[in-house]
């Protein structure tokens, strides 16, 4: 499989991933405050790839910033920058309301998760917002839930009250009771988000009739779920793997017109220590403790 530079532009940060022979070999993350610096980093990563003229694919939940980055990358490299949505379809089927618009990150995460585990699963993306999405046993994205992320919730409490301070999210101190205002806020957000995910996963399992594998990704995933028995694996770069999986499906469909772009697997797979074996980067909490 040829090389690929995958760029995921989020609300606050951009991730740049270099793929060689389906393996994610390098990742750079930068704040979005300077799109030119992000484009320069992408140019450097592109030039480091072994294949001259490697394709560049950009996904975005923040189109104004992504447009600036994509234009600058094209100017710097002379390469065509493909966009998820316009040029590359997320490699996942959906069962949603007609004309529903779903964030690219949610669909790409679903594509990567399904490619990795090949069975019903939930993807929890703990970033600026937290999303909890369900993919059924034939690889169809069924939708899910969206809620404020940890930092957004803390900021909202500060901005909409007179007395609550501005604080940054982190894991609260040990113990069930916040012994001061700051710790009480952290307890409320931290345990509240964990409880939200538990309740939603139980709700999905009851409707589906089986308990799904649960994968977590996003900047706050490790802090929220590294000690949570509900989550089977933490996959830091799931969106980048979703870009690669979607580009791979499009590439294979173009190379072999008779082959469908997305193949529905029916075999089940377990998330094992060390990952699923499909190069998606998943690792269980057992790995972290080993």
Language model: regions and residue ranges:
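Conserved phosphate-binding catalytic cores of ATP/NTP-utilizing and phosphoryl-transfer enzymes
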Residues: 1, 91-121, 244-248
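Gly/Thr-rich phosphate-binding beta-strand-loop-beta motif of the actin/hexokinase/Hsp70
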Residues: 1-24, 113, 120-141, 157, ...
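N-terminal glycine/serine-rich phosphate-binding loop of ATP-dependent small-molecule kinases
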Residues: 1-90, 282
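Cysteine-cluster motifs in flexible loop/terminal segments that predominantly coordinate metals
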Residues: 269-289
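Glycine-rich phosphate-binding loops at beta-strand->alpha-helix junctions
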Residues: 59-66, 210-227, 231
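Glycine-rich phosphate-binding loop plus the immediately following alpha-helix
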Residues: 111, 115-118, 143-186, 246, ...
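Adenine-nucleotide phosphate-binding core of ATP-dependent small-molecule kinases
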Residues: 28, 173-213, 223, 231-232
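Glycine-rich phosphate-binding/hydrolytic loop that grips phosphoryl groups
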Residues: 107, 162, 232-269, 280-282
């Amino acid at each position: 499989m040829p090389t690929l530079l995958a760029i995921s532009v989020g609300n606050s940060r951009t991730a740049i991933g270099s793929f060689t022979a389906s393996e994610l070999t390098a990742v750079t993350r930068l704040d979005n405050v300077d799109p030119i610096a992000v484009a320069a980093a992408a140019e450097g990563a592109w030039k480091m790839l072994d294949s001259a003229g490697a394709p560049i694919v950009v996904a975005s939940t923040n189109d104004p910033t992504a447009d600036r980055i994509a234009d600058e990358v094209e100017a710097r490299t002379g390469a065509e920058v493909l966009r998820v949505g316009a040029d590359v379809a997320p490699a996942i089927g959906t069962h949603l309301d007609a004309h529903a618009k779903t964030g690219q990150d949610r669909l790409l995460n679903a594509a990567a998760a399904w490619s990795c585990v090949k069975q019903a699963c939930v993807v929890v993306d703990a970033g600026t917002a937290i999303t909890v999405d369900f993919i059924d046993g034939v690889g169809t994205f069924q939708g899910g839930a969206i809620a404020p992320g940890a930092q957004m919730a803390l900021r909202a409490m500060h901005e909409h009250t007179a007395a609550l301070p501005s604080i940054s999210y982190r894991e609260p101190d040990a113990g069930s009771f916040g012994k001061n205002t700051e710790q009480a806020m952290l307890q409320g957000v931290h345990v509240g988000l964990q409880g939200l995910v538990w309740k939603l996963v139980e709700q999905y399992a009851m409707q589906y009739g089986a308990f799904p594998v649960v994968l977590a990704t996003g900047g706050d995933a490790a802090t929220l779920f590294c000690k949570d028995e509900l989550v089977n694996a933490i996959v830091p770069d799931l969106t980048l793997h979703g870009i690669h999986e979607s580009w791979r499906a499009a590439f294979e469909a173009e190379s072999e017109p008779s082959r469908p772009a997305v193949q529905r697997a029916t075999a089940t797979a377990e998330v094992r220590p060390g990952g699923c074996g499909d190069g998606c980067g998943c690792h269980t909490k057992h790995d972290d403790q080993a």
